[in-house]
Regions:
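Flavin-dependent oxidoreductase catalytic cores
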Residues: 1-350
């Protein structure tokens, strides 16, 4: 069981805090095999959430060293999720006009973005590489590149919903994935062959005019050819947030159908995610060859000892996730993470 990104808003102006270290240390002690952190912004101009972590200069490295060491103490691996928010940037006074693949963005964006220029694409590619190098120096085990949910810059370039460009970065699926492939090549060249690169994608955007499962099978094969080590299959978009982060009353293991099909076409590990909130579900998914890895986020928020309890056969002692999305709804407004069934989640200590 791995833990996928779940925003906490526990950072301080982008810097790792003791609260963040305690939060992730508790999950590592609780038996999680690998933690993928919430988004980590790779450049200083735009912020996704005010309490997110950053790594756009070397001053952030000491905090990441402390976080990596805390997680490694319990045999757990850690990978930050590298990200640029594009049209998803938080509304902070003084922030310049939003940039994005095109002039279009989701209806909840604070303004119509301007298209990023080709020179800015090249600069941002280098900034992704810079951030990965800093993370490697800090001792993390790899990075996840976020390209799912029509979300942020790379997800926005990949989807036809928001990429309306007519240059070499728009039009065909090959052109729309060019930016993502250039970022992967930059990280691989600068961090070496032994540094793990994982890419998070939507296996299907479940939206008219969006990316389909067939599209994403093709993208996954291209990612494998580009040297990616793992594919993290989510689904949906932030336009219909419930399609990406399923709530109570929705299907458990909601994106497993996509991960199962993608797994048939690649030879690298495939992870699935999406309301996998009980141990038996993850066991069934692995046995059924729907994925190689199960990502369990909210389950590990509700009970930091989820994995240890499940492994010991004490599933009845696990504090259950009820799918209320309280963890999401508050932090999208800049508030610290909160959980209905685990009110101490922001203060968890190992």
């Amino acid at each position: 069981v791995f833990m996928p990104p779940v925003s906490t808003n526990l950072a301080d102006h982008g810097y790792v805090t003791d609260d963040l270290v305690d939060h992730y240390r508790a999950r590592a002690k609780g038996g999680v095999g690998l933690i993928i952190t919430e988004v980590v912004t790779v450049e200083p101009t735009y912020t996704y959430l005010p309490g997110d972590m950053c790594c756009y200069d070397d001053t952030f490295i000491p905090g990441w060293e402390k976080l990596a060491a805390a997680v490694h103490e319990y045999g757990c691996k850690i990978m930050p999720q590298l990200f640029h928010p594009a049209y998803m940037a938080f509304n902070i006074p003084g922030t310049p006009r939003l940039i994005a693949p095109s002039f279009v963005g989701p209806s909840y964006a604070r303004e119509a973005p301007r298209p990023i220029t080709v020179d800015e694409i090249h600069e941002l590619t280098h900034q992704f590489g810079d951030a990965a190098v800093r993370m490697q120096k800090a001792g993390v085990d790899g990075v996840e590149v976020h390209a799912a949910h029509a979300h942020g810059m790379l997800g926005g370039f990949l989807t036809p919903l928001y990429n309306k460009r007519t240059d070499e970065y728009g039009g065909s699926l090959d052109a729309r994935m060019r930016f993502l492939l250039e970022v992967i090549a930059e990280i691989r060249e600068r961090c070496g062959k032994d540094f793990i690169i994982d890419v998070r994608i939507s296996g299907d955007e479940y939206t008219d005019g969006g990316l389909t499962l067939n599209d994403m099978i093709y993208v996954s094969r291209r990612l494998e050819k580009a040297g990616v080590d793992m594919i993290h299959v989510s689904g949906g978009t932030t336009i219909k947030r419930g399609s990406a982060i399923p709530a109570a009353g929705t299907q458990q293991a909601s994106h497993a159908a996509c991960s199962r099909e993608i797994k048939k076409h690649v030879n690298i590990p495939v992870a699935t995610v999406g309301r996998i909130n009980e141990a038996w579900i993850s066991e069934e998914l692995i046995d059924d060859v729907a994925a190689d890895i199960c990502m369990m986020g909210r389950a590990n928020l509700c009970d930091a000892e989820f994995c240890n309890k499940a492994a010991a056969g004490n599933a009845d002692d696990i504090r259950p996730c009820i799918g209320c999305l309280r963890c999401l709804n508050g932090n999208m407004f800049g508030n610290r993470i909160y959980c209905t069934v685990n009110p101490d989640v922001e203060r968890d200590e190992a």
